């Protein structure tokens, strides 16, 4: 078998790289970023990982729904307590269904990253027209709700 190389960049060992410092001479940067997602109930992607190949179930939908209803609020409280900024990869559908989350992100002044309309679809299997439509819908929704376009993108 012929081994293929990506040819995007040459190999470089850490021991041979130049020293890099972050602003203000800092040696370490940490990015706190999490996904805030919305799934279509019982349709689309979102299978139960305990049953590979099985269709979506009420149980795995509930795991995800818990995050928006309960889990995220504990996370916001912890971030506030530790005075840590965060970035949020957010599905556009969350903005329509969970307006309280928008208010908390705005109050904290956190960064918003586009993450598709829902996580019931996959960007990597879309044709160009569908992908462009999804990116535009997501960007427009984030801009409408936050007053500015997303700072970045993480495909669903």
Protein language model features and the residues they cover:
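Catalytic alpha-helical scaffold of carbohydrate-active enzymes acting on polysaccharides/glycoconjugates
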Residues: 2-156
